[in-house]
């Protein structure tokens, strides 16, 4: 019986699943938004949340822990210098999974978009862009 077993197997061996989640975490941290199946997105969420939590404490040990997953010095530097400071003071919820309305064409798999909640070019939550006045365009 499979009672109380957390995590999805995703139809892969343990090594393949680990490699796939590492690659997807790299892609998400580079592009900040990726499209994948719903179940993969939900599994990836936990990996990326742990990495962003690590990035909030900038220490050598935290960088080495992140490097164990990412295996890329430039990406670790980006995680700790750009992505981590964006979420300072936020106790979780760094990613969002948005379900897409149409399934994948080939096998009808449920698709989703996983993204960081605070994207790179977005304005902070308290500062919205003021709409332009029509009278000032003279």
Curated annotation (Swiss-Prot):
Keyword Ribosomal protein on entry: yes
Protein name from the UniProt record: Large ribosomal subunit protein bL17
Keywords assigned by UniProt, alphabetized: Ribonucleoprotein, Ribosomal protein
Subunit structure: Part of the 50S ribosomal subunit. Contacts protein L32.
Species of origin: Solidesulfovibrio magneticus (strain ATCC 700980 / DSM 13731 / RS-1) (Desulfovibrio magneticus)
Disulfide pairings: none
GO terms (BP aspect): translation
Record keyword RNA-binding present: no
Annotated SUPFAM superfamilies: Prokaryotic ribosomal protein L17
Single annotated GO MF: structural constituent of ribosome
Protein family: Belongs to the bacterial ribosomal protein bL17 family.
Gene3D superfamilies in UniProt: Ribosomal protein L17
GO CC terms: cytosolic large ribosomal subunit
């Amino acid at each position: 019986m499979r009672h109380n077993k957390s995590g999805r197997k995703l139809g892969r061996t343990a090594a393949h699943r680990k490699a796939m989640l590492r690659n997807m975490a790299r892609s998400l941290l580079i592009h900040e938004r990726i499209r994948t199946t719903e179940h993969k997105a939900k599994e990836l969420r936990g990996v990326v949340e742990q990495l962003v939590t690590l990035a909030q404490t900038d220490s050598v040990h935290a960088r080495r822990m992140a490097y164990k997953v990412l295996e890329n010095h430039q990406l670790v530097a980006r995680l700790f210098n750009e992505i981590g400071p964006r979420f300072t003071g936020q106790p979780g919820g760094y990613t969002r999974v948005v379900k897409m309305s149409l399934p994948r064409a080939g096998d009808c798999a449920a698709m989703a978009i996983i993204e960081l909640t605070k994207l790179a070019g977005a304005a902070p939550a308290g500062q919205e862009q003021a709409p332009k006045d029509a009278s000032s365009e003279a």
